[in-house]
């Protein structure tokens, strides 16, 4: 646990009155993780089928059969590594609830700006509200700021009109400036 003074020593931010440092946590770049996993899978002798629209998933003679528009794959085990559009398939529709989360990025910050924020580590930060804000430093000296009021779509439907949401972006920007008024 961090006292208010200890939290302020980590990140100079008026709203922070305490905190918790989780030593065994981390942040990751999802695309880099996916590419790394694919390399490991390929080296192990398994195959990765990307950009494969799945029409059906069924069990046939104790094995799993995946049917695509171009053919079928039978395997003892499969990993369904999907993206947001998994909820558009019938099999996933009632198993997945899409939740939009939004991010914004700052311009690269100067050393003076970083000093004013008192944030010199590369630890990710997350608040503990119902709709969390999360942020981290990027390798090129920006702040990736995300979270806020996500949009939840029941019945598994997503839509391009939700990819950019001006109201939520304005809210993200406002909460960023409240967190870092410097």
Question: Where are the language model's segments positioned?
Answer:
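Active-site substrate-recognition segment that forms the wall
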Residues: 54-56, 61-62, 71-112, 116-182
């Amino acid at each position: 646990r961090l006292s208010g003074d200890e939290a302020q020593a980590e990140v100079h931010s008026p709203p922070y009155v305490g905190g918790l440092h989780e030593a065994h946590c981390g942040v990751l770049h999802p695309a880099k993780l996916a590419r790394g996993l694919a390399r490991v899978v390929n080296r192990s002798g398994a195959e990765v089928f990307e950009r494969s629209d799945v029409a059906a998933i069924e069990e046939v003679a104790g094995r799993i059969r995946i049917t695509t528009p171009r053919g079928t794959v039978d395997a003892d085990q499969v990993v369904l590594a999907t993206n947001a559009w998994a909820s558009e398939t019938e099999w996933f529709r009632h198993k997945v609830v899409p939740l939009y989360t939004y991010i914004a990025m700052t311009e690269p910050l100067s050393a003076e700006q970083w000093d004013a924020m008192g944030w010199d580590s590369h630890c990710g930060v997350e608040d503990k509200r119902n709709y969390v804000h999360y942020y981290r430093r990027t390798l090129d000296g920006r702040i990736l700021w995300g979270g806020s009021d996500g949009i939840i779509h029941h019945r598994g439907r997503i839509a391009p009109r939700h990819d950019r949401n001006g109201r939520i972006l304005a809210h993200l920007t406002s909460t960023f400036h409240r967190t870092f008024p410097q």
